[in-house]
């Protein structure tokens, strides 16, 4: 550490006679004085400890709340949930169809590459739904082809 740093920490030196008078003027410390160092508690640093059954009880409570909310909400929300599920099924079906098509192209000798996918994206051959799914489909096909090459299928 540089000397300047230590000098800043040290109070300026006083003559010995001044120090003695200052010490004699101080009141003696009593035992009731609070400690100068504040003890830090565990809670200020770490999150509270969760007891064994607490987490399970909390998730059960959340589940009950969710079921209660579903009962209280109007019928439209359940139909919206059904619509979302149906859309997910459609997406799965479209993804499956895309994967089948890409695999068929590979079997016929057309190598499915990133540049081919980019070309398909630039032309208007894909529907918006297919455009959203083409890259996941491409990745699946790559994985399948890699797996097939490893196992000589």
Curated annotation (Swiss-Prot):
Residues 16-42 are annotated as: Disordered. Residues 18-29 have a biased composition (Polar residues). It comes from the Viruses. This is Protein C. It comes from Tupaia paramyxovirus (TPMV). The gene is P/V/C.
């Amino acid at each position: 550490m540089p000397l300047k740093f230590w000098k800043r920490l040290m109070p300026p030196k006083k003559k010995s006679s001044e120090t003695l008078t200052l010490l004699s003027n101080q009141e003696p410390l009593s035992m009731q004085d609070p400690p100068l160092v504040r003890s830090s508690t565990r809670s200020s640093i770490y999150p509270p400890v969760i007891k064994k059954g607490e987490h399970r009880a909390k998730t059960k409570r959340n589940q009950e709340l969710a079921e209660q909310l579903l009962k209280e909400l109007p019928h439209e929300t359940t139909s919206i949930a059904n619509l979302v599920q149906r859309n997910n099924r459609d997406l799965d079906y479209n993804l499956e169809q895309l994967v089948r098509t890409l695999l068929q192209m590979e079997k016929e000798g057309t190598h499915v590459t990133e540049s081919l996918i980019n070309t398909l994206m630039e032309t208007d051959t894909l529907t918006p739904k297919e455009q959203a799914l083409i890259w996941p489909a491409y990745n699946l096909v790559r994985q399948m082809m890699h797996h097939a090459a490893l196992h000589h299928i």
